[in-house]
């Protein structure tokens, strides 16, 4: 029998080779957890002691989840996908990554889900990187005051409730009052700026649909395509059929895509349609995660849900590229109750609100903007000088008209000044009507509102106002340089006012009413033209007892 010999040199060399060939990166540990229970898009997981808040985790079937509640013995997880296959005891692993979405210009013209995946059947999207959903909003020193206009193309808004780039302007009203229509009109109105090729004018648009019907989202996409606006628009869709977790995340996905452009020095318009449904989805998620409910069963941090989202809309300082993201959140009220929990929260966060009234909508006043209680707190500094000059008294005149109109119902005999004021107000109200998907360029708005406030329409029958406006603008396009000068200068000079005055007076001589009569004869039959000092003065009449 051969004698077993052990050579210390061989052992030393073997150990040395092993140590030299050791690669620490190949040896790793993985935290593994198990599903305790799952249902309604929520799973409770045991294990994973090192998991981070908002970290992505993977289930054994490949489905992703988002860690939310980090408790002592378990984790509450939002399932990001189909949750029917997730069962008790299923293995769960960490990814070490927080939730993020791909970003870049490849998203323009596309429809994506809340995870950034394309759902329009047009293939993969070329991305420029990824951006975390939960990023801090710009700080105070990173911002600049709002000073550039964001024109909607809607006369009532651009004249009396102006919006600036970087502003958060709430659109609030009951269902079926035209909230989405205002948002879509604003997107369509950016087409001229996009086609100009000037990066300082171009606005990239994001429409976030939260809990909408699939047919509604399809009709919005169709309207944008028909208007040629889809090429600079991204739609983030989380329809009503999606789990509550997706509806909760959709606005953050849209803002992450927009922030990428904003920090790149570009201008962005983002529409959240609507945040009421996001709050309801967050309430459902929170209750399923067993968080303590508060007022109306919403969790205690529902204010923070919207404030951290809307604070991302900003006008950045010149040092950061001077980009901007303008937010138009939409809130749906019930029976015009703006004092409910979510509406008051969002009103306090935003820089102004546009109230839409169902009574005005049903009275065929569309867009149904209630100018008396709508306000823009910062947009006045961004308003174009020409429209600011002609619309200075418009809001006051309409408010006086409303109060006088209510009084006139009970008055059997009104003095001449009150009758003239009622006539002027009726024409101004008619002038602010506008068809859907037909935004007005700012120079056309200036001419229309100038004609209304200066009494140029006082002789025109109310039923002919919109036709008069349409034909007047066509006449100015064909026969004068007024509109091109207004577009170029954006200032109402004395020469432009004189040219407008002459052009409008000339057109009135040619215009015929719907009855085929010359305008001059109709005006003299009905009432005398109103004097500015009479119309601008509100009269109060006291009856003797």
Curated annotation (Swiss-Prot):
Q: Where in the cell is it found?
A: Cell membrane
What's in the GO CC field? Answer: plasma membrane; proton-transporting ATP synthase complex
Give the first-level EC class, as a single word. Answer: translocase
| Membrane topology designation | Peripheral membrane protein
What EC number(s) are associated with this protein in UniProt? 7.1.2.2
Q: Which domain of life is it from?
A: Bacteria
The record, for PROSITE patterns, names:
ATPASE_ALPHA_BETA
Which chemical reaction does it catalyze? ATP + H2O + 4 H(+)(in) = ADP + phosphate + 5 H(+)(out)
Q: Which UniProt keywords apply?
A: ATP synthesis, ATP-binding, Cell membrane, CF(1), Hydrogen ion transport, Ion transport, Membrane, Nucleotide-binding, Translocase, Transport
MF terms from GO for this chain are: ADP binding; ATP binding; proton-transporting ATP synthase activity, rotational mechanism
Q: Where does ATP bind?
A: 173-180
InterPro entries attached to this UniProt entry: ATP_synth_asu-like_sf, ATP_synth_asu_C, ATP_synth_asu_C_sf, ATP_synth_F1_a_nt-bd_dom, ATP_synth_F1_asu, ATPase_a/bsu_AS, ATPase_F1/V1/A1_a/bsu_N, ATPase_F1/V1/A1_a/bsu_N_sf
The family database entries (Pfam families) matched by this protein are listed as:
ATP-synt_ab, ATP-synt_ab_C, ATP-synt_ab_N
Assembly with partners or alone: F-type ATPases have 2 components, CF(1) - the catalytic core - and CF(0) - the membrane proton channel. CF(1) has five subunits: alpha(3), beta(3), gamma(1), delta(1), epsilon(1). CF(0) has three main subunits: a(1), b(2) and c(9-12). The alpha and beta chains form an alternating ring which encloses part of the gamma chain. CF(1) is attached to CF(0) by a central stalk formed by the gamma and epsilon chains, while a peripheral stalk is formed by the delta and b chains.
Query: What exactly does this protein do?
Result: Produces ATP from ADP in the presence of a proton gradient across the membrane. The alpha chain is a regulatory subunit.
- What's the protein called, per UniProt? ATP synthase subunit alpha
Native species of this protein?
Clavibacter michiganensis subsp. michiganensis (strain NCPPB 382)
Q: What is the lineage of its organism?
A: Bacteria, Bacillati, Actinomycetota, Actinomycetes, Micrococcales
């Amino acid at each position: 029998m051969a004698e077993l010999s052990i050579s210390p040199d061989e052992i030393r060399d073997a150990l040395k080779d092993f140590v030299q060939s050791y690669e620490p990166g190949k040896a790793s540990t993985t935290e593994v957890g198990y599903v305790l229970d799952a249902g309604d898009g929520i799973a409770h997981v045991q294990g994973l002691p090192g998991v981070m808040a908002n970290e992505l985790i993977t289930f054994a079937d490949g489905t992703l989840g988002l860690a939310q509640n980090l408790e002592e013995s378990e984790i509450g997880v939002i399932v990001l996908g189909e949750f029917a296959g997730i069962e008790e005891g299923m293995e769960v692993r960490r990814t070490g990554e927080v939730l993020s979405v791909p970003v870049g210009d490849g998203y323009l013209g596309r429809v994506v889900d809340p995870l950034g995946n394309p759902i329009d059947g047009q293939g993969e999207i070329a991305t420029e990187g990824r951006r975390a959903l939960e990023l801090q909003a710009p700080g105070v020193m990173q911002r600049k005051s709002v000073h550039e206009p964001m024109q909607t193309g809607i006369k009532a808004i651009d004249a009396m409730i102006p919006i600036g780039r970087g502003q958060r302007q709430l659109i609030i009203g009951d269902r079926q009052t035209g909230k989405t229509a205002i948002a879509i009109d604003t997107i369509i109105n950016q087409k001229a700026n996009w086609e100009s090729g000037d990066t300082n004018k171009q606005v990239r648009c994001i429409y976030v649909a939260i809990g909408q019907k699939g047919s509604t989202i399809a009709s919005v996409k169709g309207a944008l395509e028909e208007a040629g606006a889809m090429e600079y628009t991204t739609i983030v869709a989380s329809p009503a059929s999606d789990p509550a977790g997706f509806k909760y995340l959709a606005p953050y996905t849209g803002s992450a895509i927009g922030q990428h452009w904003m920090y790149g020095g570009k201008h962005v318009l983002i529409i959240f349609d609507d945040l009421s449904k996001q709050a309801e989805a967050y309430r459902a998620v929170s209750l399923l995660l067993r968080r303590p409910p508060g007022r109306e069963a919403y969790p205690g941090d529902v204010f923070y849900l919207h404030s951290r989202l809307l604070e991302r809309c900003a006008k950045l300082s010149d040092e950061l590229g001077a980009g901007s993201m303008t937010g138009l959140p939409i809130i749906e009220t019930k029976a015009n109750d703006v004092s409910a929990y979510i509406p008051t929260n969002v009103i306090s966060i935003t820089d102004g609100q546009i109230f839409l009234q169902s009574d005005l909508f049903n009275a065929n006043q569309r867009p149904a903007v209630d100018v008396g209680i709508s306000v823009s707190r910062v947009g006045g500094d961004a308003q174009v000088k020409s429209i600011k000059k002609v619309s200075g008294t418009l809001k006051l005149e309409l408010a006086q008209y409303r109060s006088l109109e209510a009084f006139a119902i009970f008055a059997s005999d009104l003095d001449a000044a009150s009758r003239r004021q009622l006539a002027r107000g009726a024409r101004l109200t008619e002038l602010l009507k506008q068809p859907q998907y037909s935004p007005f360029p700012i120079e056309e708005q200036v001419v229309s509102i100038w004609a209304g406030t200066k009494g140029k329409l006082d002789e025109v029958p109310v039923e002919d106002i919109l036709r008069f406006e349409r034909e007047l603008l066509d006449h100015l396009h064909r026969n004068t340089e007024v509109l091109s000068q207004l577009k170029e200068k954006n200032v109402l000079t004395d020469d432009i006012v004189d040219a407008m005055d002459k052009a409008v007076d000339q057109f009135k001589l040619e215009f015929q009413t719907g009855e085929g009569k010359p305008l001059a004869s109709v005006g003299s039959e009905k009432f005398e033209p109103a004097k500015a000092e009479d119309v601008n003065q509100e009269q109060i009449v006291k009856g003797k007892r």
